[in-house]
Amino acid sequence: MLEKFTVIRGKAVPLRGEDIDTDRILPARFMKVLTFEGLGQYLFYDERFDEKGNPKPHPLNDPRYRGATILLVESGFGSGSSREHAPQAIKRAGFKAIIGESFAEIFFGNATAIGLPCVSLSPEDLGVLFRSVEENPELEVEIDLVNQEVRFGDRTAPLSIREEAREALVEGLWDPIGELLEAGELLDQFDQKLPYPRRTE
């Protein structure tokens, strides 16, 4: 059974900038891997480290946001290539959800398919959330997919997410391939009913 996402709680890290593309999220040279294991360490690598591997000023290097599990972004996040390595890197870096103004369509689909909810807030509510987290890095943020709202401090903001994605996340049906693999016997039964020629021994 896949995880059901109803309420996600955690500290957030604010990442400002519009139209952040997948090549910035995960530089292409780190995509030459057979599995996604370990991709989290390369998240925003070229923006976080210099050529010698020394840390640069970046929210993900800021000790105030250590342990954050929610990523705050602005509009057009995840544009660029269609590879799923970018959302995989975000998830494997320990993030459980992303809050932004808008997301690239393919990135949104890839993120949903690995159980990484991406929810949108209005520019006004997102701006308040950014400022609140920057002023208080310890602020707890709640993403309620059932009631479709984000809560932080004494504020509640309505979130938006495609209904089919929300239902899949809430019901634990977000990984279609995983669902197929778990339905082994049903698939075999269905296969036996298909009207195509079968090889006889």
Swiss-Prot record:
One of its GO terms (biological process) is L-leucine biosynthetic process. One of its GO terms (molecular function) is 3-isopropylmalate dehydratase activity. It comes from the Bacteria. One of its GO terms (cellular component) is 3-isopropylmalate dehydratase complex. It is an enzyme of class 4 (lyase). Keywords: Amino-acid biosynthesis, Branched-chain amino acid biosynthesis, Leucine biosynthesis, Lyase. It holds the Pfam family Aconitase_C. Heterodimer of LeuC and LeuD. Belongs to the LeuD family. LeuD type 1 subfamily. This is 3-isopropylmalate dehydratase small subunit.
